[in-house]
Amino acid sequence: MQLSAPKHAMTHESRLDRLLRQLLWGRRTAALATLQTLPGAETVPFTTPAVSFVPYAIDSTAQVLVLHVSALAAHTRNLRQSPAVSLLITAPEDAAQPVHALERVAIQGQAVLLAPEAAASARAAYLRRFPEAAPMTALGDFQFVQIIPSVGRHVAGFGAARDLSAEELKALLTS
């Protein structure tokens, strides 16, 4: 089910902001990059990127992205070691269009693992987008994670790329 972008109260929104808002609110999955620490050859820890595929929601009140993660997942262990993350959200591929022009946004940020008593807003946002996940939200080994955006890079096509500040990203996460 494709979700449409929320009605936005701004009187004028740039074409690139409109495209990015539609991408963020219209897609439901992202690639999540975390930092994984591996044992080194001489007992020196070695940190390497690790990528997972995750569903995400948007908590427009808190202006964050929301994940629901299992304690068994490698990315959850990684988040406990380092909160630095990157999310990559892409438009669907179109066989008639070059993949190099595929619209996408990479969002760097900090992950905050939420205690159950602090997760009401995140849970509500997640269940609005994924009502079928309600039974999973009651499982004890799952928890909600807020991704607080720091910076981003939006590519809307050839010659249409821009850097985004935390403030610009948060404005696009507001309904």
Residue ranges and their predicted role:
Residues 2-9, 13, 129-175:
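C-terminal edge-of-domain segments
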Residues 2-80:
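An N-terminal domain-cap segment
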Residues 22-25, 31, 67, 81-82, ...:
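Hydrophobic/basic alpha-helical segments enriched in Actinobacteria
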Residues 31, 51-55, 106-108, 144-146, ...:
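Conserved hydrophobic/aromatic beta-strand scaffold that supports enzyme active sites
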Residues 35, 70, 90, 157-159:
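Surface loops and adjacent helix of pleckstrin homology
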Residues 43-44, 72-129, 139-142, 149:
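Short, structured beta-strand-loop surface elements
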Residues 62-64, 84, 151:
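Structural motif
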